[in-house]
Design a protein with these regions (language model features):
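Short, Lys/Arg-enriched N-terminal segments with co-localized hydrophobic residues
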Residues: 1-23
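Detector for intrinsically disordered, low-structure N-terminal pre-sequences
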Residues: 9-11, 20, 29, 201, ...
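Intrinsic disorder/low-complexity segments
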Residues: 11-13, 26, 221, 241
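Intrinsic disorder/low-complexity signal
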Residues: 18-20, 108, 115, 230
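Short, charged, low-complexity amphipathic alpha-helix
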Residues: 18-74
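Long, charge-patterned amphipathic interaction tracts in eukaryotic proteins
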Residues: 25-42, 73-172
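Long amphipathic alpha-helices with heptad-repeat character
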Residues: 37-40, 44-47, 51, 87, ...
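A long, low-hydrophobicity, low-complexity, charged/polar interaction segment common
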Residues: 118-243
Length: 243
């Protein structure tokens, strides 16, 4: 009897430790998603800074009234080529970071802790409820498992009516989101600086991805970029005008 109790207790302790390890691993992966996203935002900031310097160079050339039109056009072309050359390394680095981000998100979605002690009570609550839970309550449940795609899908499977669609909507497709970000950045990098208008979209998608996994970046994104939305829009307008 004592041996059976000892084995049971040891097994329970081992399971608790395993769950703690899973939770720690999940927390580390979530932080990694945030850290990589911040690195990408900083890289995008370098593209913004480089373009600012480029426009300043063009402005200085245009001010020289003694320069011929042909000379100014040649200087503009040279400045643009230098801009693309100087930022090529930054674009390559961001591509590598986004690949790492996708791998991290894939690992996160596959290893999230569905053995969370709070999961089964919530599954039971949704399964046994005769009708959909109030929005405030289902929102609290979703917040509890924010970023845990597998847990949210498990809850959605037993949820009623609009609770089901609500929970499914909260179960972020991290892999698909990162693929979309990578595609947008590829278009941005391949056409830079003419594709500068894609930069705010990439930034916003990164912020949303982090929020989906429970890490708020918010206004700090502009700090990492070194420019706010107004600055970027101004640069986009200058590029569109050929300035």
């Amino acid at each position: 009897m004592f041996l059976r109790f000892f084995c049971f207790r040891a097994g329970a302790i081992l399971q608790i430790r395993k769950d703690k390890v899973k939770t720690m691993a999940n927390d580390m992966l979530v932080k990694e998603v945030a850290n990589i996203s911040v690195d990408v935002l900083s890289g995008l900031g370098k593209l913004v800074s480089a373009y600012k310097a480029y426009t300043e160079t063009l402005a200085a050339v245009q001010k020289q009234i003694e320069y011929t039109k042909e000379y100014k056009e040649k200087q503009t072309q040279t400045a643009r080529e230098n801009l693309v050359r100087k930022t090529a390394g930054t674009c390559d680095t961001i591509r590598i970071q986004l690949e790492s981000l996708e791998n991290t998100v894939n690992s996160l979605d596959q290893t999230l802790n569905v053995a969370d002690p709070e999961l089964m009570p919530c599954v039971g609550l949704l399964a046994n409820s005769p009708e959909a839970l109030p929005l405030e309550l289902i929102g609290s449940v979703a917040e509890k498992f924010k970023g845990n795609r597998l847990a949210l899908l498990a809850l959605a499977a037993v949820a009623k009516e609009n609770n089901k669609s609500f929970l499914e909507g909260k179960a972020v497709d991290g892999s698909g989101a990162v693929k979309q970000i990578r595609n947008k950045f590829d278009m941005l990098a391949d056409g830079y600086p003419k594709t500068l208008h894609l930069l705010p979209e990439v930034k916003n998608d990164l912020v949303k991805l982090c929020e989906a996994y429970g890490h708020e970046i918010g206004d700090a994104a502009d700090t990492y970029l070194g420019a706010d939305y107004g600055d970027i829009v101004n640069l986009i307008m200058r590029e569109a005008a050929g300035l």
